[in-house]
Design a protein with these regions (language model features):
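Short, flexible turn/loop "capping" segments at secondary-structure junctions
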Residues: 102-103, 150, 230
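Solvent-exposed, acidic/flexible segments
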Residues: 39, 43, 47, 54, ...
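Extracytoplasmic c-type cytochrome modules immediately beyond a signal peptide or single-pass transmembrane anchor
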Residues: 39-92
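C-terminal cap of thioredoxin/glutaredoxin-like
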Residues: 2-47, 51, 71, 188-265
């Protein structure tokens, strides 16, 4: 997930404003400490000095932007932790979601995903490896079809496959088989897995399946999720699919085991 252009622009503007203010204070102190007031300074001259200084030292702007990014991320993580705690039952133990790995595991890893999300597809091997390597992880899968009707059809097919005991197999093949995930692909994959395709197509219309999608969407909105994938490990959050996703997942699983989590997870 990337910051929206508007947010990035706002951050840069905030950095510049902060630098101008800081530079003004420094100049006042250097010019006449305790005597010269900020209001008596030549504003244009100060702005010009700051502009010239930034032009010669652009790395300062980068450093300030990086620091703002860190603070914003920390604030967002803190807010998300509270939201996770307030919605722990629906996030970790909803009967509408499906669980892979150990259903009685001691740590829950929740993934929000879309079958047409390239980053979700890239993350799949790390998620599968986590479940295979750690027999105590409980993987809660939240279908969040944000890429339109084709994604929604694929999600419904996967949820319908659960009625025939093949949810996780269907889940993996929808990611690994080439081509866009849509209804046609889902039905073909279902046939390859030996499912009753006619029954699956009928089960896709089950109101409980739509309820599952609606619940995941509502939770994503509460969490402020702007894209997929998103991982919750207890009340720890991993947005997107970083290159070291497996390492981050195992680290946070270990943290939850050692320290617990604020949410009832």
């Amino acid at each position: 997930m990337n910051l929206k252009t508007g947010l990035a622009t706002a951050l840069v503007a905030a950095v510049v404003a902060a630098l101008v203010t800081a530079a003004t204070i420094v100049l006042v102190w250097r010019l006449a400490p305790g005597v010269v007031k900020v209001s008596s300074l030549d504003e244009k001259r100060v702005v010009g000095i700051v502009h010239d200084y930034l032009a010669k030292n652009p790395e300062i702007l980068v450093e300030m932007t990086t620091e703002l990014d860190k603070r914003t991320a920390a604030e967002q993580a803190e807010k998300q932790q509270k939201i996770v705690g307030d919605n722990a039952e629906a996030i970790f133990r909803s009967p509408l979601a499906h669980v892979a790995g150990n259903p009685n595991g001691d740590v829950s890893v929740v993934e929000f995903f879309d079958y047409n999300c390239g980053f979700c597809r890239r993350a799949l091997p790390d998620v599968v490896k986590l479940v295979q390597d750690d027999g105590k992880v409980r993987l809660v899968l939240k279908e969040l079809p944000i890429f339109g009707e084709e994604s929604e059809a694929a999600a419904k097919a996967a949820l319908a496959a659960a009625k025939q005991g093949k949810y996780f197999e269907m889940h993996q093949k929808l990611f690994t088989e080439p081509g866009k995930a849509d209804k046609d692909k889902a039905l073909r994959v279902a046939g390859e897995l030996g499912l009753d395709v006619a029954q699956l197509e009928k089960d896709m219309q089950d109101p409980e399946i739509q309820k599952s999608l609606d619940e995941a969407k509502e939770l994503a909105q509460k969490l402020g999720l702007q894209g997929t994938p998103l991982y919750l490990i207890g009340d720890r959050v991993i947005p997107g699919a970083p290159d070291d996703l497996y390492d981050q997942l195992t680290k946070k699983v270990a943290e939850v085991r050692e320290k617990g989590c604020k949410a009832t997870c």
